[in-house]
């Protein structure tokens, strides 16, 4: 049975996109190469051999069978939802709205009426910073912390001992309903945290995403899909036969091993620690360590591939930890294909929908959106 595996290394951009300045990226982001430089280099022989590092501008020669290059996102966004959607053939032509000055008061008031309590925050902020600023007030009052970022997100942070997880998720479902037209906010995110005023507050791994419903895409055509990590949530679960909602790279590793034992034709996984723990927190050394750890995971995955498998490694956007910003960056993304018949430097390809086109071609599915990288 032919099988396709796509692993997204979240935030591992491969160099400044031509339209980066239109997305407020003026400091020439280049996530992978800047992580390499800032960390003094790192050992990742499997990522080097397949061409993933070379695609990211790192001076490591691929082996002769490597088929690799870069993809240029054409959708109007630089976030995980837009990136994953584009991989599966969705071209987001109009950007989702952002709220740098906070959400409209009518939206906040409607949300407060529905959940039966006031909220605090309503501003653009770093998620780790705002819980330090408002965590004590939240604990004292029980009022949820509502905030946004540079992305189109409505985030709700609550202490796990004050607002139980399921209640927080219910808040998010209410917000998801309210955040459709005319607001059309792309994603509602539950941000549970723990801690106290004395020791500080820390986000937990029980985050949950509630995205805007995905337009029709390749997953609807395949349907026999095993999703690992945040991926199923980005598509509102539609088309996934099996899912494993893991929360960290070590958990994703275990889930991916389980997925490879299944009979799913398409395995779609996201490893988010690069972005979540190191990109947003401007930690290039931690980013490098995570790449070294993932390289070991890649070695295991390669050893379990069959002759009928292809494995595609890519990213959904950039998140350069060496920049002053703590937000995503508009970059090319690397792509490396393992299991293809021949090696080649593919250069730059327009459209991340090339991922879906390649998966569809390998699985024998009639799909006309994107460039098949097996034939490029």
Residue ranges and their predicted role:
Residues 1-376:
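Feature captures the catalytic ectodomains and active-site-proximal regions of enzymes
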